């Protein structure tokens, strides 16, 4: 079960994350989703990382940019998206966070980060830190059994695939990797938010292509 991994993530949060923030886990469709999206590492902009937050500890709660991306590629209902646009972070309730992730599940995708050690800001993490999370991420893949996995950015792609990856050189290229005897399919995509936001149009193009490939 995914929940059984959370205690391990909490221990790694104490080791590598901000002490005043909680680890952020994952969320979405957990039974053979069409796509598993793997981001880098959570920040304190996610209000679910606050210790006072007693709801789900899933990625991107209280933020806007990534939900705009999902809306633009057809993976978020307009009604939910309009509510997200109208809300400040503090306006998100536990119930609304659940509503958003019910919509994610309905659209058959799963959201996670390679790293789960929440930082106060979007500081870069060394490969060594991400490598401590790699086997746990592989375990997530094993549990949810996604059709395709999308890796955002060069660093995440390189660590998960075990090869030096430059997204600009492998756009729309299908990678295959065997993990515990099972073959998984991967695409490497530009990181679409934060420092990578200038690449968002290219990310959207490639994600639409991937969705079409997966769903036909």
Task: Show the residue positions of the predicted features.
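Catalytic phosphate/metal-binding cores of nucleic-acid and nucleotide-processing enzymes, i.e., regions
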Residues: 170-172
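Short, surface-exposed beta-strand/loop micro-motifs that present aromatic residues
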Residues: 26, 174-178
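Ligand-binding pocket scaffold of soluble enzyme catalytic domains
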Residues: 196-208
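Charged phosphate-binding loop/patch that engages nucleotide di/tri-phosphates or the phosphate backbone
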Residues: 209-216
């Amino acid at each position: 079960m995914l929940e059984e991994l959370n205690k391990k993530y909490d221990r790694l949060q104490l080791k590598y994350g901000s002490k005043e923030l909680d680890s952020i886990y994952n969320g979405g469709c957990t039974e053979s989703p069409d796509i598993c999206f793997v981001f880098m590492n959570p920040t304190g902009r996610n209000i679910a990382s606050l210790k006072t937050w007693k709801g789900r500890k899933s990625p991107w709660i209280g933020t806007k940019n990534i939900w705009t991306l999902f809306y633009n590629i057809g993976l978020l209902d307009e009604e939910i998206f309009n509510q997200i646009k109208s809300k400040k972070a503090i306006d998100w309730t536990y119930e609304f966070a659940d509503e958003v992730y019910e919509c994610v599940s309905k659209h058959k995708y799963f959201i996670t980060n390679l790293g789960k050690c929440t930082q106060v800001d979007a500081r870069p993490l060394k490969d060594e830190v991400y490598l401590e999370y790699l086997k746990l991420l592989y375990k997530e893949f094993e549990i949810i059994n996604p059709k395709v996995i999308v890796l955002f950015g060069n660093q995440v792609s390189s660590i998960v695939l075990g090869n030096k990856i430059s997204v600009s050189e492998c756009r729309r290229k299908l990678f295959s990797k065997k993990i515990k005897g099972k073959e998984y399919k991967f695409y490497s995509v530009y990181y679409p938010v934060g420092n990578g936001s200038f690449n968002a149009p290219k990310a959207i193009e490639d994600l639409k292509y991937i969705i079409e490939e997966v769903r036909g």
